[in-house]
Amino acid sequence: MWQRGVIAIIFAALTIWLGYFVEQEQFLAIIAGYAPFFLLYLFVYVRTEKAALHFWLGVGVFLRIILLFSFPNLSDDIYRFVWDGHLINHGFNPFDHLPGYYIENDVLPGVLTPELYNLLNSKEYYTVYPPVLQAIFAVSTWLFPQSIAASGVAMKSFLLLGEIGSIWLIGQLLMHFKLPAKNALLYALNPLVIVEVTGNIHFEGLMIFFLLLAFWWLRSSTPKMHIGSALAMAGSIASKLLPLMFLPFLIKKMRWRSVRYFTIIGVALLLLFAPLLNGLFFNNFGASLDLYFRRFEFNASLFYILEWIYLVVFNEDYVNLFLGPALAFVAFFAIIALVVWRRASWRALPTSWLFAVSIYLLCTTTVHPWYLCLPVALSVFTNWRY
């Protein structure tokens, strides 16, 4: 018992180190925090017996609570969250204009300042955050209009609730599929998930909660549960667009029942997006997505290999203008092939989804660390590990 206590204290110390003291540019300090964190995480997973499972799940929740009041030093996305939230609260649609528009035309709402504008990491593109996130931004900045840090705490509160829900749902789904209960620790104690979701305010955590909730209700044969599942799936898509890639697998499994399911998702998404829809929305949102596939390059895998080969052979430097979209098409058709090839069963669905998101991550031009939170969550129901 005392060993558990010591390890839990070390977990807490490493969480505090990564959440409160390390800055984004301090690479060695980040590695110094993550390396022992992951080693202990693996040790706990391998050694944990059933009797200690609830203790470690509680530790996972506690570590997230520790990060509730930290400022997200490892990510500067919070400034765009706050920017969008204030725009909504002052009657502006965040999808209408680039941030520079408000500076150039001197129409900044009172709480938005040139100083905040200079902190944005995304001045050159329109916002890409779907309506569920925009609502959270608006509520958080409405509660604390004068404080970025306090608005961040409010956003983290939503994520914390989602993470607690995800841990519970993972436990229920593992029990339902008669899988090892300690697999829940693969998500609950994962250092990357803890630090990037609750610590650095990345809403993959909320997307995962809604996706797990949709899956939990979907495996029921009750029509009411299927309605709830469709609404939860809409919430997941309206948090991050990524779960759209999972829908074709449901068509194969549900067959004619998918018509009603997809209709509910479509209506729910229309209602969620309705407050933001206007003549500019599709053009501006599409422009940002196009920019993502054509211009952004970070931690890519297949893209970097093909780019290097192209540059060696053709000695031209505009490869990213077409290679990114080309890989997106490759990913699309690979996922469709996966839908056709994989057997349709609720038990096999998480593995199919895991393969699909793995194909996406292999082909995309940008892979931030927090993108791995989704495959980590899905892998707990499979024999594969991230």
Model segments located where?
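Start-transfer (signal-anchor) and selected internal transmembrane alpha helices
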Residues: M1-L67, F71, M175, S345-T351
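Transmembrane-helix motifs of polytopic, lipid-linked glycan transferases
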Residues: L39-V46, V139, V153-F177, F333-W341
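Transmembrane-helix signature of polytopic, membrane-embedded enzymes
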Residues: K50-A51, F55, I167-P191, W346
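Intramembrane catalytic core of multi-pass membrane enzymes that act on lipidic substrates
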Residues: K50-K156
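Hydrophobic alpha-helical membrane-interfacial segments at the cytosolic entry of transmembrane helices
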Residues: W56-L63, R255-L277
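Specific aromatic-rich, kink-prone transmembrane helix
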Residues: G165-L169, L206-S221, V357
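Aromatic/glycine/proline-enriched transmembrane-helix motif characteristic
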Residues: I167, R295-T366
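Membrane-interface alpha helices of multi-pass inner-membrane proteins
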Residues: I194-V197, L213-W217, M225-I251, F355-L362
